[in-house]
Amino acid sequence: MADQYHEPVSELTGKDRDFVRALNSLKEEIEAVAWYHQRVVTTKDETVRKILEHNRDEEMEHAAMLLEWLRRNMPGWDEALRTYLFTDKPITEIEEETSGGSENTGGDLGIRKL
């Protein structure tokens, strides 16, 4: 457990440790998506493929839940996600356009526009 911290645990608040837990879990979920996806695209058995697709998609849901928790709780995530998600703008040009900020999307992340 100590290897997940780069600073003394005693100097971290409970909330900071929750951030570490969520971030580590997010990394694990993303890794699981990658593993399942590789299995999906290489299996020859259709039934196995469908099961693995289901498992991969479940991991995506878990990752999305963790991102939402981070957005609501850890400073910086809300602004970053509002800036870069749910837009058709070229990803590499968004930061230049916003100068590090983001426009007000009315609290829906622009989803209603989809």
Swiss-Prot record:
Residues 86-114 are annotated as: Cargo-loading peptide. GO terms for molecular function: ferroxidase activity; metal ion binding. Pfam families: EncFtn-like (PF22277). Residues 103-114 have a biased composition (Gly residues). It is found in: Encapsulin nanocompartment. Keywords: Encapsulin nanocompartment, Iron, Iron storage, Metal-binding. Fe cation 2 binds at E29, E59, H62. GO terms for cellular component: encapsulin nanocompartment. The keyword Iron applies. InterPro entries: EncFtn-like, Ferrit_encaps, Ferritin-like_SF. Its main location: other. One of its GO terms (biological process) is intracellular iron ion homeostasis. The 15 or 30 C-terminal residues can be used to target foreign proteins to the nanocompartment. It comes from the Bacteria. Fe cation 1 binds at E29, E59, H62. Belongs to the ferritin-like superfamily. The C-terminal 15-30 residues (cargo loading-peptide, CLP, or targeting peptide) are sufficient to target this protein to the nanocompartment in vivo, while the C-terminal 5 residues suffice in vitro. This is Ferritin-like protein. The lineage of its organism: Bacteria, Thermotogati, Thermotogota, Thermotogae, Thermotogales.
